[in-house]
Amino acid sequence: MIPFTAQYLLVCGYVILLGVILLERSGYSAFGLLEKRQDYFHNSHAIMLSSRQDLGVSGPALYELFEKHLLDAYRIPGRYPGGISTLYDTFSEYVFKGTSHENCSVETSAVAKLTRDVTPLPIHSHNDYWRDVPLLKGLAYGSVSTEADVWVHPHKDHPYNSSTDKLEDYVLAVGHDEDYIDPLRKTLEKLYTDPLQSLLEGVNCGKSNNSKTQKNGVFYTANHIPLFFYIDFKSDDNILTYKLLLEKYFTQLIQAGYLTYYDMDTGKIIQGQVTVIMTGNYPNNTDVLDNGKADGYFGDRKRYLLQDANLLELNEESAKMAVTASTSLSEILKMVGSSNLKVIMRGHLDKEEITAIKKYIDNAHSFDLKTRIWGVPSWPRKTMKRLWKQQIEDLNSDFLNVDDLKAAAMF
């Protein structure tokens, strides 16, 4: 028989446990350490997002602060109806809150909030659109290169006919697989071009397209460094994709003078704050690129969408309209008589492989192109980091193709 004192303590324990469960279900934090969860989030959210409020951290520290401390926010339904996610919406709202082109200051800009303490790194944010916070997370970790896979999708239900429809009838949805795209919420405009426009406007107060003053880029401490933006053409109709990019999605960035372009008169690449690079199923016929005109798509003797050349088939002609050259590790190893399996089993590139691969890298550099090797194994982690080091130190490649931003930033 249980003594009375033990029975009393047991009953008290059950009562306390029941109380904790009821508090959790009603939204209150266990043991009353925090106020009601939803109110706590809303109140702290309101404090963080008050006009021009600055949390005092930027870069990875800022992103990780939101990522860790918004865990309970996922339990709050409908915080941002129609938004991307609670994390994305809250983070981007903080970054852009209180910033505008009309009343802007570099010190209080979105760029300052996001990248004030960030050192730009030779990192390409691979499959960036898969990240919880596309574009902004990569910038916070110092990635100087990002990418978006785009699919043509009709605005509404009607037969697909690019010859009769208007451009406004279509959107470019962002995603790796067409079956999983979200053409309402996850478009190129919402995830990339609009945020880029806002970032750049906030640090280029009063600078017009015709201004001779050098415009600032997206990195606060290195405003001369451009962002490389790969657009991977996924849809079969690459001509419609190309037209949408120029006439809808990049129009404002072009008009503001932010895009890198190819000068048809001098044959040179003129650097801007954002360098847009076509990859995948993109058109390369000059009639398409220039819209059938002798003086360029917009009649200004400029081409704004540049190309990613094949690193393994590079020549003077293919390099002319390119700014980068890329290939996969498996393809370049095949060209030099090796394979991914051999490298993984060994844990690194050997001297013969390095010598043979470096010839391709050096060839690209002779055309003033930056290089990227994708498809580098991400496991074992030791092998991944060894290959990162060899790409930088031995091959002198320009961009590391990275999935794990935190690991690369700490590398």
From Swiss-Prot:
Example GO biological process: lipid metabolic process
InterPro entries linked: HAT_RTT109-like (IPR051236), PLC-like_Pdiesterase_TIM-brl (IPR017946)
Signal peptide: 1-29
MF (Gene Ontology): phosphoric diester hydrolase activity
Keywords (A to Z) from UniProt: Signal
Domain of life: Eukaryota
Family the entry assigns: Belongs to the AIM6 family.
Name of the protein in question: Altered inheritance of mitochondria protein 6
Species name: Candida glabrata (strain ATCC 2001 / BCRC 20586 / JCM 3761 / NBRC 0622 / NRRL Y-65 / CBS 138) (Yeast)
Lineage summary: Eukaryota, Fungi, Dikarya, Ascomycota, Saccharomycotina
Gene name as annotated: AIM6
